[in-house]
Amino acid sequence: MSKTDWNASGLSRPSPSAHWPSRKPWQHGQKYQTTQDRTEPPARKRRQAVRVSANHASQQLDQLKAVHLASAVRDLEKAMTTLKLWESPQEISRHQALGYSVIMFMITAVKRLRESKMLTLSWFNQALMVIAPSQEETMNLKTAMWILANLIPRDMLSLTGDLLPSLWGSGLLMLKLQKEGRSTSS
């Protein structure tokens, strides 16, 4: 069979059906090497394991945490609305005179967390400046943020900003603040 066959695409190109001899040039007196004459099998590429970069794996983990955080925030929002409905009329009238209760601060924080996905120390400080004259409201805000920090799973706290991770696990500090708040308001 000749190297150049007639084919539809052109005269000078070899036909894809033509069998090529071995890579060694043919010399007079030698016969072509067939596939049965070859002693070694053709070299095969080894399959390589797919490697996922640490950065990609970290991004996937962060995305998964963000999804779980969104679910936790939705659950907290449902719980807060339920708590608000369970509040007694006496508590509501007392809080109206006072301003914000712990539950109201938690509802506000959860809404902010749902909308902006961040609770920052600067937001917390601004809220403290607004309610500064009232010691009880200040304690309610601190208590609400501490409770929220302990309700959200610890591995997701880093996604919520810098406020909640700094409050997580500071139970002794909160008890001390509550005692100070009660002693000054009494």
Swiss-Prot record:
Query: Is Ribonucleoprotein found in the keyword set?
Result: no
| GO process annotations (BP) | symbiont-mediated perturbation of host autophagy
Coarse class of the primary localization is host cell
Q: Which InterPro entries match?
A: Paramyxovir_NSC (IPR003875)
Q: Which Pfam families does the protein's record reference?
A: Paramyxo_NS_C
Sorted alphabetically, the keyword list is: Host cytoplasmic vesicle, Host nucleus
The ranges of region (Disordered) come to: 1-45
Comp. bias (Polar residues): 1-15
Q: Name one GO cellular component term.
A: host cell cytoplasmic vesicle
Query: Where is the protein situated, by its record's location annotation?
Result: Host nucleus; Host cytoplasmic vesicle
The free-text function statement in the UniProt record for this protein reads: Ribonucleocapsid-associated protein that interacts with the phosphoprotein (P), thereby increasing replication accuracy and processivity of the polymerase complex.
Entry's family note: Belongs to the morbillivirus protein C family.
Assembly, per entry: Interacts with the phosphoprotein (via C-terminus); this interaction allows C to associate with the ribonucleocapsid.
Quote the protein name from its UniProt record: Protein C
